[in-house]
């Protein structure tokens, strides 16, 4: 049984709105993490082709929206195949955040790629947050496909404010992750300008700690850096968010909520490493297991409507309601 694993959490800047260049940078970071002994490497929300930061500066930008569609990643594509091949060549698990292009509709998606290059699962964010809805669609059921067994342990992933969705979190906890990847866009310190603390560096770190404590898993809090090139590319200098260089606050939290990593300056790129000892999970589980001994399913339980809902369904495979015949 695996007892320890070395992980790598990126804090990096994509090549904004450039699919090919960001895929190349992804592979470079995968190789770097593997060369430093990592068995798993993580990437933030919409890492490919970069988070669409302009949505917080203006409600509509048709030119950038068109560019974004054309540079978003298709799961069945040569670009994804390149990332899979890189994972296999470096024998490392990859948890990838990306803007998914599915027939030119976009979704905030994550993929967990095995160390042999096989895609173990893909998932879409349950619901885009606020202005993200001007770009992205909702999941249609595959948001629940979030935890899989890998060579680095049992790994799960959620994106951004999915971490404040109590029912979705509990569903993920119940799948018994050992390592949780929390993918975020660029995040900034809270300021007294009317912005939400829960969207800040400090607020999201609190969310990560809470997730670790509630799930008794290691949380790999993965964020993006935005530099002046990104600000200029998306014209966000007058926006409410992501208007100045920075955004990085990647971190690693233990199953009792303690921070296990030292921060990288917010405007700098780098990779955070840690050796995770799964013994710490057992220490926490001995005290609390919200899906086990510290629960009351006879009183409170979660119902789930499972399965992916397709837009077109064959009537032959669609359940027909049965009407009971009343006796005369």
UniProtKB/Swiss-Prot annotation:
InterPro entries: C-N_Hydrolase (IPR003010), C-N_Hydrolase_sf (IPR036526), Nitrilase/CN_hydratase_CS (IPR000132), Nitrilases_CHs (IPR044149). The keyword Hydrolase applies. PANTHER family: ARYLACETONITRILASE, NITRILASE. Nitrilase that hydrolyzes preferentially phenylacetonitrile, (R,S)-mandelonitrile, and 3-indolylacetonitrile. Residues 5-278 form the CN hydrolase domain. It comes from the Eukaryota. It comes from Aspergillus niger (strain ATCC MYA-4892 / CBS 513.88 / FGSC A1513). Its EC number is 3.5.5.1, 3.5.5.5. It catalyses: a nitrile + 2 H2O = a carboxylate + NH4(+); 4-chlorophenylacetonitrile + 2 H2O = 4-chlorophenylacetate + NH4(+). It is an enzyme of class 3 (hydrolase). The active site is at 45 (proton acceptor), 125, 160 (nucleophile). This is Arylacetonitrilase. The keyword Signal does not apply. Belongs to the carbon-nitrogen hydrolase superfamily. Nitrilase family. Keywords: Hydrolase. GO terms for molecular function: arylacetonitrilase activity; hydro-lyase activity. It holds the Pfam family CN_hydrolase.
């Amino acid at each position: 049984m695996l007892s320890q694993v070395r992980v790598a959490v990126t804090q990096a800047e994509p090549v904004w709105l450039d699919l090919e260049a960001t895929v190349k940078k992804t592979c470079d970071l995968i190789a770097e993490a593997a060369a430093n002994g990592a068995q798993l490497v993580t990437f933030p929300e919409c890492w490919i082709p970069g988070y669409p930061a302009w949505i917080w500066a203006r409600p509509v930008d048709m030119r950038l929206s068109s560019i974004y569609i054309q540079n978003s990643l298709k799961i069945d594509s040569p670009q994804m195949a390149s990332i899979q091949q890189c994972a296999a060549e470096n024998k490392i698990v990859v948890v990838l955040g990306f803007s998914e292009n599915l027939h030119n509709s976009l979704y905030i998606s994550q993929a967990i790629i095995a160390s042999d290059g096989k895609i173990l699962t893909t998932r879409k964010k349950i619901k885009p947050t606020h202005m993200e809805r001007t770009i992205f669609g909702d999941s249609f059921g595959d948001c629940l496909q979030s935890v899989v067994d890998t060579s680095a342990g049992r790994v799960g992933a959620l994106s951004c404010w999915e971490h404040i969705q109590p029912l979705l979190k509990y569903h993920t906890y119940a799948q018994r992750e050992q390592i949780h990847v929390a993918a975020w866009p660029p995040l900034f310190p809270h300021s007294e300008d009317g912005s939400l603390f829960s969207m800040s560096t400090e607020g999201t770190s609190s969310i990560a700690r809470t997730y670790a404590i509630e799930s008794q898993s290691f949380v790999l809090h993965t964020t993006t850096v935005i530099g002046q090139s990104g600000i200029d590319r998306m014209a966000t200098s007058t926006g409410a968010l992501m208007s100045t260089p920075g955004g990085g606050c990647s971190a690693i939290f233990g199953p009792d909520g303690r921070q296990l990593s030292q921060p990288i300056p917010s405007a700098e790129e780098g990779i955070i490493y840690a050796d995770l000892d799964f013994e710490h999970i057992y220490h926490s589980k001995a005290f609390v297991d919200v899906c086990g001994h510290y629960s009351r399913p006879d009183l409170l339980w979660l119902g789930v409507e499972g399965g992916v809902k397709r837009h077109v369904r064959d009537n032959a495979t669609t359940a027909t309601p049965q009407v009971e015949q009343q006796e005369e």
